[in-house]
């Protein structure tokens, strides 16, 4: 018996339902993942900034300073410059210890400003002030100041505006520091650590650019997860009247491989939670579950993204390449010397130490 052809009305209904289901599913997907769209489509609507001119960085142990200066196209000074290190501090106590121990022989004055308010206008403890005993080794070189910005709980400042207010406050500390024309001032965050050999070049070589960005090896969660060389905001500035503290692009020249930038490199899970709600991108905490300690611990050991975000890239090639977790590295070579000398104390910053304490 011949099979009856499908009913024309049923076929038309099917043709209508299939696209409707597909469109509805797409809209539902976009609704739940709309925060990904700007990042997914960024290569279409945004252009990368002007590339830096990268200065090659020459260094090897026991190579003389005259030769190192010469290799960079600079000349040896008769005496070393003074170096000032200026940072706005939040809660990175362990990295600050690594920073100050590593840079102590080269820095004339450490300038540290601490606020009782986060970028998101939350009241915060003065973590440094509560832990000054950890930094007694640097107290003779330290100029510390507290800053209490005016905050209205009913109308808090936007996070990036508050960040700008706090960074501008560092300028008063610079003016009190005794800095003079021709000195070098490092402007960076606490987790952006120039290498000692970089500071040695800045101390002893004449001819360096007046504003030199520092290309830092970027790590996430610890030195077990190297990301790339994308960190550029730290700068070395030849001081002149009118030089102001900034954490943004100031020139087109960058010194290659000039140190380390370890983002979210904390000992305790609670420190991760604090930063997630305290820094300028706190709006990325879209759900309370993002702050769950077990979730954070899992992401740290996977090399994933705490905010479930797509990478901020300008090409689809880089976007796709960075959509996977950060590959682990077993190398602890070319890291800060103090870190290696105190590996037991800072095990959480080294390969194999991803498990954190919960308290």
What do these predicted ranges mean?
Residues 110, 142-146, 211-213:
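Conserved beta-strand scaffold positions in the cores of enzyme catalytic domains, especially
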Residues 1-86, 91-92, 106, 305-308, ...:
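Juxtamembrane luminal stem/stalk of type II transmembrane Golgi/ER carbohydrate-processing enzymes
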Residues 50-83, 116-188, 195-200, 323-339, ...:
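Active-site-proximal specificity loops/subdomain of glycosyltransferases
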Residues 92-105, 109, 119-130:
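Short, well-formed alpha-helical segments that are part of the catalytic scaffolds
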Residues 111-115:
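Short internal beta-strands
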Residues 192-308:
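Conserved catalytic core of nucleotide-sugar-dependent glycosyltransferases
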Residues 93-95, 118-121, 152-153, 193-195, ...:
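Eukaryotic short linear interaction motifs
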């Amino acid at each position: 018996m011949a099979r009856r052809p499908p009913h024309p009305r049923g076929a038309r209904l099917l043709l209508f339902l299939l696209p409707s289901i597909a469109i509805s599913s797409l809209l539902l997907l976009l609704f739940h993942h709309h925060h990904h769209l700007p990042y997914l489509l960024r290569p279409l609507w945004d252009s990368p900034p002007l590339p830096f001119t990268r200065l090659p960085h020459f260094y090897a142990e026991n190579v003389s300073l005259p030769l190192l200066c010469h290799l960079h196209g600079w000349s040896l000074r008769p005496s070393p410059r003074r170096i000032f290190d200026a940072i706005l501090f939040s809660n990175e106590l362990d990295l600050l210890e690594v920073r100050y121990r590593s840079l102590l022989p080269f820095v004339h004055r450490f300038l540290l400003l601490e606020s009782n308010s986060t970028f998101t206008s939350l009241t915060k403890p003065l973590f440094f002030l509560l832990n000054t005993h950890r930094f007694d080794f640097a107290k003779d070189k330290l100029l510390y100041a507290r800053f209490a910005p005016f905050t209205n709980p009913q109308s808090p400042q936007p996070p990036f505006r508050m960040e700008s207010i706090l960074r501008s406050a560092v300028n008063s500390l610079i003016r009190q520091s005794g800095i003079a024309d021709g000195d070098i001032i490092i402007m960076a965050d606490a987790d952006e650590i120039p290498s000692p050999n970089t500071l040695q070049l800045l101390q002893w070589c004449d001819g360096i650019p007046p504003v030199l960005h520092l290309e830092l090896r970027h790590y996430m969660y610890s030195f077990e997860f190297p990301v790339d060389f994308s960190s550029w905001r730290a700068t070395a500035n030849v001081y002149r009247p009118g030089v102001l503290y900034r954490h943004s692009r100031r020139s087109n020249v960058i010194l290659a491989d000039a140190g380390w930038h370890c983002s979210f490199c904390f000992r305790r899970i609670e420190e991760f939670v604090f930063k997630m709600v305290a820094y300028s991108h706190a709006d990325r905490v879209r759900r309370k579950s993002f702050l769950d300690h077990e979730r954070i611990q899992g992401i740290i050991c996977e090399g994933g993204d705490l905010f479930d975000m797509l990478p901020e890239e300008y090409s689809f090639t880089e976007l796709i390449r960075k959509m996977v977790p950060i590959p682990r590295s077993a190398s602890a070579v070319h890291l800060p010397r103090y870190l290696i000398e105190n590996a037991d104390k800072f095990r959480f910053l080294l390969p194999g130490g991803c498990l954190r304490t919960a308290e």
